[in-house]
UniProtKB/Swiss-Prot annotation:
Tagged with keyword Transmembrane helix: yes
SUPFAM superfamilies listed in its UniProt record: NAD-binding domain of HMG-CoA reductase, Substrate-binding domain of HMG-CoA reductase
Name under which the protein is recorded: 3-hydroxy-3-methylglutaryl-coenzyme A reductase
Positions glycosylated per UniProt: 224, 238, 553, 596
GO term, biological process aspect, one: isoprenoid biosynthetic process
Catalytic activity reported: (R)-mevalonate + 2 NADP(+) + CoA = (3S)-3-hydroxy-3-methylglutaryl-CoA + 2 NADPH + 2 H(+)
Membrane topology, Cytoplasmic segments: 1-34, 321-330, 377-422, 466-524, 644-1176
Species classification: Eukaryota, Fungi, Fungi incertae sedis, Mucoromycota, Mucoromycotina
Biased composition (Basic residues): 700-721
Pathway listed: Metabolic intermediate biosynthesis; (R)-mevalonate biosynthesis; (R)-mevalonate from acetyl-CoA: step 3/3
Length: 1176
């Protein structure tokens, strides 16, 4: 018998270990990042608040009604000729094949003037026409929509094929197809339409002629005075089936919330009444609702609820008193209350998501019992233990995180145990099947779970901030004890008595033994209270949570006559053999619109009304409310960031002072140890010619020195990483891995070299990107043959590594500066644009600038984008060539739209424009050509291709995907298909240069240029078998602009496809030049364009980021600029070749200065001017 006990004990220990570990991790995360945790919980609670507020706005609390009526259900079995009232929850008494009908009524009232005026009756008839024929449900246009007269109404003669009357599917598809009249009861029974009414000369006589109908339609009818206070419209809905019932409810909601017109719904009374009237209505409804509930309840119910509210108030008072006794006046007690409030909102939202309706009556009765039984004992216990541990030593000498974690360790498992047992009891109550009790127990169980989670996350973060504030007070000389002493001196006798009555004897913290003894007793008492509460309701000792409100009075003439007519017509129909079940719903009140008069001046009410209307719109709107929450999220995180930045300088000064004290102490006591350490430290010597002898410094010391100076500018919070030269043992360093700021650089290097830390993960582990790059650089340098990288001239500091990580490069050891020159400005399509070019080739920028000057003198360049489509060419395989051919034909014909729709569904910007399919044996190559907005688009189109291939696989299951990229694109490789079909942006540019400019600026003639272009660019390239290379040096200019603007340099292979054409025009006096580039692959978002230097160049061109109104226009503009710049470079180089200036210019420019030897100091001036390039 011992084995089972041992197994059960082991299982319990395992469960306790899992729960304890989870609590510790949550608490550790909260204490490490308290502000972030508070922000996250506030955001979740904000989402819950917006949703619940929108839900409350639709409640009748906000409408003009005072008393809430519940529907009355009546049932007529097959043989009965009258209705009998049935319980609305007793579904078992209703036959499965019963015809179900909902009866909704609209009551239009005007007690002051009556409703028998011609104008009012005309408004009612117009309203009836609109309600029956113009209100469609549901709102979505993506599904079939239905109106009352055509689809929703109950028709006395249903189709003869009617069967399976309770089937949802039958109800959805068999919406009344015959044109039999709908059942409705209204003034239209007297006047057919508005025209008939207006033609009626004597309304009183007409009513007398139809007196029986009029008595049931008009309320308080007085013929002698031609007066009636109200008019009733009755509508019967066929709700046989859940879908029909849902449609009827939607129709009712849309009618009840119609905007004010001639008739105003009391549900929308706030839209017509002023703000003060609306607030008065809400207050009045709440008061009358409470009075109604008190009248309906038994005396014992009232006593139980009243005692519950008194105990709830006492619980709140006790909480504040006990927290004040521990040293927190209002902060922690308010935080505990908010902890419970957040849990309550999240629990209510969860219960709503589970499809359980919790009525306001249940909530009103449940809140005091929730506050008392669940209470605030758990957060109070945690707070008390935290303050006990914080008083063991001065706060200035404590690690706040450690103090809170000690407290969590001692109380976590007892709290979890009590909470778990209470949840089990409440879950059993939720399974009891008693209406009201089920909802209460389910809500309580979920609330307990949320309260437990939020306490060890949000409230723990609040405790961490509270202790930090107390520590700051102690540093400034003000302790919590001093505050408590100051408050106790002024406490009177009565106040002390009240505080003693509501306070916990051990709130200030006595001995631990007593607390351990009291803790289980409190938990057991609470558990017994919950058990007793559930048992009391199961055995019906009291009826709270089960009271049923007043129902619709079906004996009123306006309802009774309608029910009799409904039953009579049903018995005369083809479905007389079926039972009839009718639910009579409360009437929807409307009143005739009147001019409002208020005792409050318009100057006050109008601004308040505008404010409330704006608030209602933004809070109720399903999209705007989410964006408001996101804006709150961003705002809170920005404030968090700024708060951290604001408090850093003070912390740094304190840390520096402490470091100085520690350093002085070490130097005064351990000088011998430090000298030995320095002697033992190895020195790495670099080859002589590389390092200058002007400064003698070891590489390690130099790196630390540089790293220190860089951190003083951009990483102040890590300035003390490597101030100590003592390298601790590896085991001690491993223990400090989670606090990398405590390790110096040499210790991190030793961890990597010993396999305790991955080199590629340095950024993630250290949290300081620049420090990680420097350490990786040292590691690679020491492992290399030459060992020169660590002290090399490759820059390290002041770079945006946060933009690089995870996007542009891995295993970063620095960055490579490339000089950026500017050609131009160049007149491109009427705009003067400076062209940035990053290059190390001398003469390139100057040559392009000369071409710009010549083109500008001729009126500038004109460009046009003739095609835009990034491509991807996956490769798939079939078992036979017949299946491959069948796939090709299917994609080119009926499958084209299917594939296109699947592709386009993956992105807002990617749009499939063209498909080109080729076969090679059993292999099929599909070339997708797609517009991708302002992105270059390779990732975007790859995602679309995957989706399209999955759709093709559904039609061809035997298809096998070989590769998502089958080199049929073709990307980063020379290919004729890009030259012929195009890829990316296909651009053409042209310019006309006068002959005089050719001779003056370019130093040659038009004839010489034309002849050179034909011989070199056309015939020469053809002789070489070139594909797309009919140009002089298009790749030169394109790649320079690519590097400057963050494009993919490897794509210059296909992007440089260009044909340059020159022709003598205007009687051979002027030169016409054009460049055609069919495959320029560029983007202005993503990739290297996220780096700030590259973004600055895009800013200079005016094409950074996505275009605000026309997606893709910025990327097309960049392609136009590149093509025009290529034309300028082509023109200048061809002119230099024609004039024989090329060699002279390159010799002068590239050999003008001698490259200096790298030294640790600034390079001395050579005193020579750089060489000149092609002169104009």
């Amino acid at each position: 018998m011992s084995l089972p006990n041992h197994s059960g004990s082991s299982a319990f220990k395992s469960f306790s270990y899992i729960v304890g570990t989870g609590i510790k991790r949550a608490a550790k995360l909260s204490t490490r990042n308290p502000i972030e945790m508070i922000v996250v919980v506030l955001i979740l609670s904000s989402f819950s608040y917006f949703y619940l507020f929108n839900l409350a706005r639709t409640s009748d609390i906000f409408s003009g009604t005072v008393t809430r009526l519940y529907p009355t259900s009546v049932y007529a079995p097959t043989k009965d000729h009258s209705f009998s009232v049935v319980d609305r929850t007793a579904d078992s008494t209703i036959a499965n094949n019963a015809v179900k009908v909902h009866l909704h009524q609209i009551v239009v009232s005007d007690p002051k003037h009556g409703v028998l005026s011609r104008q009012t009756l005309a408004s009612v008839l117009r309203f009836q026409q609109m309600a029956e024929n113009e209100i469609y449900v549901p709102d979505s246009t993506a599904v079939n929509r239905f109106a009352f007269n055509k689809d929703l109404c109950y028709k006395t003669t249903l189709p003869s094929s009617y069967s399976s009357h309770s089937s949802d599917s039958n109800s959805n598809s068999n919406l009344n197809s015959k044109t039999s009249p709908c059942f409705a009861h209204s003034p239209a029974d007297i006047w057919q339409d508005e025209a008939t009414l207006l033609a009626d000369k004597n309304i009183r006589s007409t009513i007398e002629a139809n007196l029986d109908t009029a008595k049931n339609v008009f309320g308080d009818l007085q013929l002698n005075a031609t007066y009636a206070s109200s008019v009733t419209l009755s509508y019967a809905f066929n709700t046989t089936g859940d879908y029909r019932e849902h449609l009827a409810d939607m129709w009712k909601h849309k009618v009840a919330t119609l905007p004010p017109a001639d008739l105003v719904s009391l549900s929308n009374i706030g839209q017509q009444e002023n703000v003060f009237a609306w607030l008065f209505i809400v207050t009045r409804n709440v008061i009358f609702r409470v009075k109604e509930l008190i009248d309906l309840a038994d005396n014992i119910d009232i006593i139980v609820i009243l005692v519950g509210y008194i105990m709830m108030i006492a619980t709140f008072i006790s909480l504040y008193v006990n927290m004040r006794a521990m040293g927190s006046r209002y902060t922690l007690a308010t935080a505990v209350v908010f902890n419970g409030f957040f849990s309550f909102m999240l629990a209510l939202l969860t219960v709503r998501a589970l499809g359980v309706d919790v009525y306001p009556v249940v909530l009103a009765e449940a809140i005091p019992f929730l506050a008392v039984t669940i209470g605030f004992e758990r957060p109070f216990k945690l707070t008390k233990r935290v303050f006990q541990f914080s008083k063991e030593t001065p706060l200035t000498k404590q690690e706040i995180r450690t103090t809170i974690m000690r407290a969590v360790d001692t109380v976590a498992l007892p709290i979890a145990r009590d909470c778990f047992m209470e949840i089990i009891v409440l879950v059993l109550g939720a399974k009891s099947g008693i209406s009201g009790l089920e909802e209460f127990c389910l809500l309580s169980a979920i609330l307990l779970a949320y309260d437990f989670i939020i306490m060890f996350t949000w409230y723990t973060a609040v405790l961490a901030l509270k202790l930090e504030l107390l520590r700051i007070r102690e540093i400034n000389g003000i302790s919590a004890d001093d505050i408590k002493k100051g408050t106790k001196k002024s406490t009177g006798y009565i106040r002390r008595t009240v505080i003693k009555a509501f306070s916990d004897d051990h709130a200030a913290g006595a001995n631990t033994a007593n607390q351990k003894a009291d803790g289980p007793i409190i938990g057991r008492v609470k558990l017994l209270m919950i058990v007793g509460f559930v048992v009391m309701h199961i055995f019906k000792f009291c009826s709270a949570f089960q009271s049923v409100g007043p129902q619709v009075n079906i004996t009123e003439p306006s309802i009774a006559v309608v029910l009799d007519q409904l039953l009579e017509q049903h018995k005369a129909s083809s479905q007389a053999s079926l039972p009839l079940f009718v639910q009579v719903f409360p009437a929807m009140p409307f009143h005739v619109a009147t001019v409002n008069k208020s005792f409050v001046p318009d100057a006050i009410t109008r601004p308040l009304e505008a404010l409330f209307d704006t608030y209602a719109v933004y809070i109720q709107h399903p999209v705007i409310s989410k964006w408001l929450t996101i804006a709150l999220f961003v705002s809170l995180f920005l404030n968090t960031y700024l708060f951290n930045v604001a408090k850093q300088p003070k912390q740094i000064v304190e840390q520096v002072n402490q470091d100085k004290k520690i350093t002085n102490a070490i130097e005064s006591t351990n000088n011998t140890h430090i000298e030995v350490t320095e002697k033992q430290k190895p020195t790495i010597q670099s080859p002589g010619p590389v390092v200058s002898s002007a400064v003698v410094m070891s590489p390690n010391h130099k790196r630390s020195h540089n790293h220190h100076h860089s951190h003083s500018h951009s990483h102040n919070h890590h300035s003390n990483h490597h101030q100590s030269d003592i390298v601790r043992p590896i085991d001690e360093c491993v223990a400090l891995v989670r606090t990398p700021e405590m390790l110096n650089d040499e210790e991190v290097i030793s961890l990597v070299e010993n396999g305790k830390m991955a080199s590629y993960a340095l950024e993630k582990v250290l949290g300081d990107l620049q420090r990680a790059v420097g350490i990786r650089r040292a590691l690679i340098s020491r492992a290399s043959i030459t060992k020169t990288l660590e002290a090399s001239a490759l820059p390290l500091e002041n770079y945006h590594y946060d933009k690089v990580m995870g996007a542009c490069c891995e295993n970063v050891i620095g960055y490579m500066p490339i000089p950026v020159g500017v050609a131009g400005p160049m007149n491109i399509d009427g705009d003067l644009i400076h062209i940035p070019m990053a290059t190390t080739e001398g003469c390139l920028v100057a040559s392009t600038a000369r071409g710009c000057k010549a083109i500008n003198a001729g009126g500038g360049a004109s460009t046009i984008v003739i095609a835009d489509g990034m491509t991807r060419g996956p490769c798939v395989e079939f078992p036979t060539i017949l299946r491959a051919a069948a796939c090709k034909l299917w994609i080119e014909n009926e499958g084209n739209d299917i594939v296109t729709n699947a592709f386009n569904s993956t992105s807002r910007f990617a749009r499939l424009r063209k498909l080109k399919i080729a076969l090679a044996g059993k292999l099929v190559f599909i070339r997708f050509s797609t517009t991708t907005g302002d992105a270059m688009g390779m990732n975007m189109i790859s995602k679309g291709c995957e989706k399209a291939l999955s759709i093709i696989t559904e039609h061809f299951p035997d298809m096998q995907i070989i590769s998502l990229s089958g080199n049929y694109c073709t990307d980063k490789k020379p290919a004729a298909i890009n030259w012929i079909e195009g890829r990316g942006k296909s651009v053409v540019t042209e310019a006309v240069i006068p002959g005089a400019i050719v001779e003056k600026v370019l130093k040659t003639t038009v004839a010489a240029l034309v002849e050179l272009n034909i011989s070199k660019n056309l015939i020469g390239s053809a002789m070489a078998g070139s594909v797309g290379g009919f140009n002089a040096h298009a790749a030169n200019i394109l790649t320079a602009i690519y590097l400057a603007t963050g494009q993919d340099p490897a794509q210059n292979v296909e992007s440089s496809n260009c044909i340059t054409l020159m022709k003598a025009v205007n009687d051979t006096k002027d030169l016409h030049i054009s460049c055609t580039m069919p495959s320029i692959e560029v983007g202005t978002i993503g990739g290297g364009t996220i780096l700030p230097p590259q973004q600055s160049m895009l800013d200079m061109l005016g094409v950074r980021g996505p275009h605000p109104t026309e997606p893709g226009k910025n990327a097309q503009r960049l392609a136009r600029i590149i093509c025009a710049a290529v034309m300028a470079g082509e023109l200048s180089l061809c002119a230099a070749l024609a004039a024989g200036h090329l060699v002279k210019a390159h010799m002068a420019h590239n050999r003008g200065t001698q490259a200096p030897t790298i030294t640790s100091g600034p390079a001395p001036s050579t005193g020579t001017e750089p060489g000149t390039c092609i002169k104009s």
